[in-house]
C-alpha cells in the first residue's frame, strides 16, 4: 500500500519548543510531537496532504496519549482550519488505560488501523486534510503527543492481483519491519511437532503392508502348517507389542475364512462354568486380562474365549449407554473419579436430578438428593455398581446395589437375561443375609424421622468383595461432606417442613425382602410424598450474572455461592461482558475503574446485599450496599 506524503502543518493547538508538530512530517527522524505543557486535556494538529487521496489505513505511534481520534476534511471550500467541517475517519481509540496513564507505563504503543477499523463512509472519499486530536484526562504530570503517524492509500490493482515476490521493508517511525517471504524455508513455532506427527502418520500408513503380505502367505499355506508360526511368535516376545497385535488380527481373519479350523475352539467349551469365578475373586480378572494380551503365542482356539468374555476398547463406552447418573454425598477427588468412570462407560452425568435421570449414586442415606429422588420414585444405588461395572467391563444389574427406589426394571431384566444363570445363582444366596445388619447399623445415624417401608428395604448391598473395603474407606471420607453445587440448607429446611405436615406412612409387615419388585407397588398403594408439592425457592436472581472478587473471610465465599445458586442467579468464573454485579468484601480497587471503562453497567456491591435478599426473600435495591471510591 503506497504511503501518502504530507506537505506541511496547517495549524496546531499546542506544541513543545523541541518536539514540534513538524516532526510528524519527517519520517526518518526519531523526533516527536508533544504538548507545550503538562496537564492539557486535549491537543490537536491539522496536516495538509500533497493531494487529495483516499485513505486506506492509518499507522499511529503513541507518545503518552490516552485517546487518539482522526478526522478528515478538504481545503477546496476555502475555509480556514478552524472553521472547516471535518468528518470522523477513525473513532476515538484507546492507547493507554487509566492505570497505565497514571504510572506512565507503555507510553509508546503502536496501533495499525486497517480498512475494517475506519469509518467506511469517510474512507471511500478523497481528502487532502487530516486533523488528529489527542487527549490525556488521567494524568497531569507530563506532556503527551504522538511519535509518528502514517497514512496509506489503497493498493494498486496490479499489486493486489500479483503481489511482488521481493522482500519489502516497512518503516514505522524508528522501527523497520521486515516482511519475510512466505515461501522462505524458515523454522516456525511448532514446526518440529507437526513434522513428527507427519512422520508418524506416514510410518503408520506404511505398516499395514507387512501384515497383508503375511496374510497372503498364510492363506497360501496348508492347514497343517498353521501351527508353525507359533514358535516364531513366541520367540519374538522380546519385541514391541505391535507385531503380535497384527498377527492376532490375522488370526481373526483366518477364523472367519477357514471353517475347518473352528473345531479347535470346541475343547475350551467345558470352561464355561469358570465364568462365575471372576465375580467371587474380582481381583483376578484384571490380572488375567493383561496376561491374555501379553501371550502372543496362544493358539487361536483358546484366544477366542476370553475375547468374547470381555468387552473390547470400542465397547467400553456402550456398557452404561442410556444411563443418566446423579451423584450425592461424595467429596472430591473421589467424586470426580467416580463421575469419570461412569462417563467412560457411556453414561451421562447430571449435577441435579432431572426428568431424564435414571440412577442416583449415593454415598449414604438421607442426603437432600436421596430424599428428593426417594419421593419421586427414582432408583438409588450405591457406588459399587459403577465400580464393579468398570472393573468387570460389563453391565451388572443395578438391583443388586439398590439403596432405595424402583426394585426392578426392563433395563435390569435385560441385563440379567444376558448373563449366564450360573453366574447369578451362587451370588444371590450369599449376598442377601447382610442387608439387615447394615440397615440396623445405619438406623441410629439417620435422622429421627421413622423410616418408610422403602427405606427399611432400601440398603440391599451388592457383592461384598474386595471393592467393598475400598468403598467403605471412601464412604468414611465422604461422610458428612456436602455435595458441591447443592443448596443443602434450603433442601433440608424444605424436607423438615414436609415431615412436620404429614406423618410417615406406617410400616407394612410381612414383606419379602428378596422381592425387589415390591418397591414399585408400595409407591402406588401407599400415599406417596411426591403427591405433596415441594415449595419452590424464589428466583429473584434469575437472569443476573455475578462475579466474586477478592478474598472473603471464613466460608463466606461458599455461602455466597449457595445463595446465588439457590435464587437462580448465575456465577461467572471470570470477569466478562456478561457480569452485572461484582460482589467483594474489599474497599474500592483501582481495577474497578478499568472494569467500568470496559462495562459501564457494572455494579460493585457488598456481600450483605445477598444476605439481606435472603432474609427478606425478595430482591432489594443494590444501591444501598454499593462499594464506592473513597474521597
Swiss-Prot record:
Q: Where is this cross-link: Glycyl lysine isopeptide (Lys-Gly) (interchain with G-Cter in SUMO1)?
A: 178
Give the domain of life. Eukaryota
Which Gene3D superfamilies would you find in this protein's record? BRCT domain, Galactose-binding domain-like
Q: Which InterPro entries does the UniProt entry name for this protein?
A: BRCT_dom, BRCT_dom_sf, BRCT_XRCC1_rpt1, Galactose-bd-like_sf, Xrcc1_N
State where composition is biased (Low complexity).
277-291
Keywords (A to Z) from UniProt: Chromosome, DNA damage, DNA repair, Isopeptide bond, Nucleus, Phosphoprotein, Repeat, Ubl conjugation
The Gene Ontology CC terms held by the record are: chromatin; chromosome, telomeric region; ERCC4-ERCC1 complex; nucleolus; nucleus; site of DNA damage
* Intracellular or extracellular location(s): Nucleus; Chromosome
The name this protein carries in UniProt is DNA repair protein XRCC1
State the organism of origin. Answer: Rattus norvegicus (Rat)
Write the gene name: Xrcc1
Amino acid at each position: 500500500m503506497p504511503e501518502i506524503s504530507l506537505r506541511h502543518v496547517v495549524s496546531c493547538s499546542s506544541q513543545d519548543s523541541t518536539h514540534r508538530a513538524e516532526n510528524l512530517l519527517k519520517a526518518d527522524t526519531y523526533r516527536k510531537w508533544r504538548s507545550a505543557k503538562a496537564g492539557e486535556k486535549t491537543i490537536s494538529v491539522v496536516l495538509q496532504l500533497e493531494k487529495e487521496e483516499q485513505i486506506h489505513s492509518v499507522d499511529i505511534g503513541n507518545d503518552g496519549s490516552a485517546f487518539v481520534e482522526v478526522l478528515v476534511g478538504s481545503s477546496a471550500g476555502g475555509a480556514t482550519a478552524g472553521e472547516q467541517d471535518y468528518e470522523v475517519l477513525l473513532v476515538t481509540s484507546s492507547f493507554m488505560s487509566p492505570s497505565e496513564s497514571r504510572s506512565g507505563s507503555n507510553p509508546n504503543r503502536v496501533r495499525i488501523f486497517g480498512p475494517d477499523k475506519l469509518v467506511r463512509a469517510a474512507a471511500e472519499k478523497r481528502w487532502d486534510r487530516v486533523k488528529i486530536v489527542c487527549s490525556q484526562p488521567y494524568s497531569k504530570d507530563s506532556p503527551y503527543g504522538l511519535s509518528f503517524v502514517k497514512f496509506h492509500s489503497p493498493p494498486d490493482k496490479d499489486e493486489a492481483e500479483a503481489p511482488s515476490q521481493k522482500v519489502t521493508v516497512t518503516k514505522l517511525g524508528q522501527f523497520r519491519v521486515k516482511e519475510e517471504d512466505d515461501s522462505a524455508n524458515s523454522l516456525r513455532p511448532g514446526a518440529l511437532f507437526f513434522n513428527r506427527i507427519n512422520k508418524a502418520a506416514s510410518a503408520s500408513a506404511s505398516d499395514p503392508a507387512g501384515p497383508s503380505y503375511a496374510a497372503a502367505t498364510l492363506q497360501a499355506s496348508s492347514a497343517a502348517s498353521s501351527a508353525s508360526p507359533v514358535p516364531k511368535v513366541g520367540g519374538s516376545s522380546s519385541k514391541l507389542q505391535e507385531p503380535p497385535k497384527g498377527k492376532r488380527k490375522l488370526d481373526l481373519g483366518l477364523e472367519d475364512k477357514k471353517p475347518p479350523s473352528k473345531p479347535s475352539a470346541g475343547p475350551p467349551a467345558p470352561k464355561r462354568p469358570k465364568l462365575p469365578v471372576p465375580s467371587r475373586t474380582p481381583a483376578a480378572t484384571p490380572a488375567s486380562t493383561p496376561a491374555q494380551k501379553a501371550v502372543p503365542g496362544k493358539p487361536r482356539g483358546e484366544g477366542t474365549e476370553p475375547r468374547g468374555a470381555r468387552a473390547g476398547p470400542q465397547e467400553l463406552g456402550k456398557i452404561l449407554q442410556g444411563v443418566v447418573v446423579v451423584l450425592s454425598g461424595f467429596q472430591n477427588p473421589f467424586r470426580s473419579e467416580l463421575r469419570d468412570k461412569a462417563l467412560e462407560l457411556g453414561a451421562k452425568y447430571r449435577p441435579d436430578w432431572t426428568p431424564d435421570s435414571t440412577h442416583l449414586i449415593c454415598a449414604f442415606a438421607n442426603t437432600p438428593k436421596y430424599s428428593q429422588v426417594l419421593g419421586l420414585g427414582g432408583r438409588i444405588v450405591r457406588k459399587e455398581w459403577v465400580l464393579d461395572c468398570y472393573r468387570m467391563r460389563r453391565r451388572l444389574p443395578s438391583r443388586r446395589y439398590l439403596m432405595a427406589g424402583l426394585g426392578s426394571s426392563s433395563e435390569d431384566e435385560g441385563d440379567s437375561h444376558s448373563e449366564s444363570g450360573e453366574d447369578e445363582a451362587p451370588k444371590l444366596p450369599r449376598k442377601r443375609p447382610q442387608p439387615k445388619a447394615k440397615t440396623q447399623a445405619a438406623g441410629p445415624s439417620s435422622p429421627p424421622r421413622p423410616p418408610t417401608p422403602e427405606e427399611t428395604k432400601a440398603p440391599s448391598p451388592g457383592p461384598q468383595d474386595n471393592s467393598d473395603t475400598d468403598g467403605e474407606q471412601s464412604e468414611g471420607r465422604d461422610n458428612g461432606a456436602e455435595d458441591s453445587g447443592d443448596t443443602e440448607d434450603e433442601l433440608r429446611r424444605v424436607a423438615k417442613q414436609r415431615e412436620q405436615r404429614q406423618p410417615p406412612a406406617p410400616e407394612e409387615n410381612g414383606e419379602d425382602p428378596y422381592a425387589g419388585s415390591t418397591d414399585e407397588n408400595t409407591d402406588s398403594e401407599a400415599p406417596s410424598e411426591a403427591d405433596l408439592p415441594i415449595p419452590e425457592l424464589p428466583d429473584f436472581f434469575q437472569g443476573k450474572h455475578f462475579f466474586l472478587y477478592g478474598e472473603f473471610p471464613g466460608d463466606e465465599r461458599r455461602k455466597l455461592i449457595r445463595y446465588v445458586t439457590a435464587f437462580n442467579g448465575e456465577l461467572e468464573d471470570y470477569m466478562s461482558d456478561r457480569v452485572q454485579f461484582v460482589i467483594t468484601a474489599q474497599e474500592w480497587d483501582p481495577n474497578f475503574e478499568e472494569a467500568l471503562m470496559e462495562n459501564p453497567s457494572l455494579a460493585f456491591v457488598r456481600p450483605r446485599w445477598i444476605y439481606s435478599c435472603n432474609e427478606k426473600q425478595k430482591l432489594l435495591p443494590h444501591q444501598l450496599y454499593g462499594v464506592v471510591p473513597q474521597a
